[in-house]
Amino acid sequence: MSEDEEKVKLRRLEPAIQKFTKIVIPTDLERLKKHQINIEKYQRCRIWDKLHEEHINAGRTVQQLRSNIREMEKLCLKVHKDDLILLKRMIDPMKEAAAAATAEFLQLHLESVEELKKQVKNEEALLQPSLTRSTTIDGVHTGEAEAASQSLTQIYALPEIPRDQNAAESWETLEADLIELSHLVTDMSLLVNSQQEKIDSIADHVNSAAVNVEEGTKNLQKAAKYKLAALPVAGAVIGGVVGGPIGLLAGFKVAGIAAALGGGVLGFTGGKLIQRRKQKMMEKLTSSCPDLPSQSDKKCS
């Protein structure tokens, strides 16, 4: 059984796929968002034990989300190639929501790390004598603007998790799960796109092959007509030169068949008979083969 024969129409799998895209996965994403809010709250308040528990619970949700996406991916792989565009439209909103939720979750820790780097850099700068002063550009003190921006960042950035806390280790595990989830969502999108590109490539090759076959068929038909037209003339010329029964034999020899009539006229007649016989054979052969659709017919359809 070929791969295409194992595929099914989207309408047969649509209810199961929509159950994932509209119910199961959105529910997981909503649960993940609640974990994110709790994690931000516990980390900001420095409640490390609660933060550790929330990291573990969030990790379970991420694993469940990954499992559900894989199950949906199995269904997507069964969809017939003709329905891949509709399938892509169906799963794209879910894919974008999952990618955005994962990126937003990872951004929590990223902002904390960036803020920590800024704090270390500022502390190093304070240890050195100040060599520059704030300058004024268009009436705005750049030093004051940078200080205001830094204080605003400190308000929203989360405090660093102490390395001696279990929450630090549980976050690393959760972060790895989130990154794997992000890769899974990306791979699923690439899988559907690659299937469509593969189909488009096959279609292009089929169209090119059809053009080549069509042109080759025309050339063969022309060559066959030229060959058939030459048979009576060649038979007449050779039959006229040789004459008699041998001339007739020579006339048939040109056509590829021997018979016994006689003379130059009979040589022409022998070639003519073979021409008709070969013409009938060619018509019978071409009529038994299916017509190749031309490129103009495809465009019109």
UniProtKB/Swiss-Prot annotation:
**What is an annotated GO biological process for this record, any one?**
autophagosome maturation
Q: What is its main location?
A: endoplasmic reticulum
* PANTHER family recorded: SYNTAXIN, SYNTAXIN-17
Modification Phosphoserine, positions: 288
* Keyword Phosphoprotein annotated: yes
Q: What are the TM regions of this chain, as residue ranges?
A: 228-248, 254-274
Q: Name one GO molecular function term.
A: SNAP receptor activity
Q: Which residues carry this modification: Phosphotyrosine?
A: 156
Kindly list any coiled-coil regions of this protein: 49-128
Q: What is this protein called?
A: Syntaxin-17
Q: How does it sit in the membrane?
A: Multi-pass membrane protein
Annotated region Required for interaction with COPB1, TMED9 and TMED10: the residues are 273-301
Q: What's in the GO CC field?
A: autolysosome membrane; autophagosome; autophagosome membrane; COPII-coated ER to Golgi transport vesicle; cytosol; endomembrane system; endoplasmic reticulum membrane; endoplasmic reticulum-Golgi intermediate compartment
Organism, as annotated: Rattus norvegicus (Rat)
PROSITE patterns annotated for this entry?
SYNTAXIN, T_SNARE
* Modifications made to the protein after synthesis: Phosphorylated at Tyr-156 probably by ABL1. Dephosphorylation by PTPN2; regulates exit from the endoplasmic reticulum.
Q: Where in the cell is it found?
A: Endoplasmic reticulum membrane; Smooth endoplasmic reticulum membrane; Endoplasmic reticulum-Golgi intermediate compartment membrane; Cytoplasmic vesicle, Autophagosome membrane
What is the similarity comment for this entry?
Belongs to the syntaxin family.
| Motif Endoplasmic reticulum retention signal per record, residues | 298-301
| SMART domains reported for this sequence | t_SNARE
Lumenal compartment segments: 249-253
The record ties this protein, via InterPro entries, to: SNARE, STX17_SNARE, Syntaxin, Syntaxin/epimorphin_CS, T_SNARE_dom
> What's in the keyword line of the UniProt record?
Acetylation, Autophagy, Coiled coil, Cytoplasm, Cytoplasmic vesicle, Endoplasmic reticulum, ER-Golgi transport, Lysosome, Membrane, Mitochondrion, Phosphoprotein, Transmembrane, Transmembrane helix, Transport
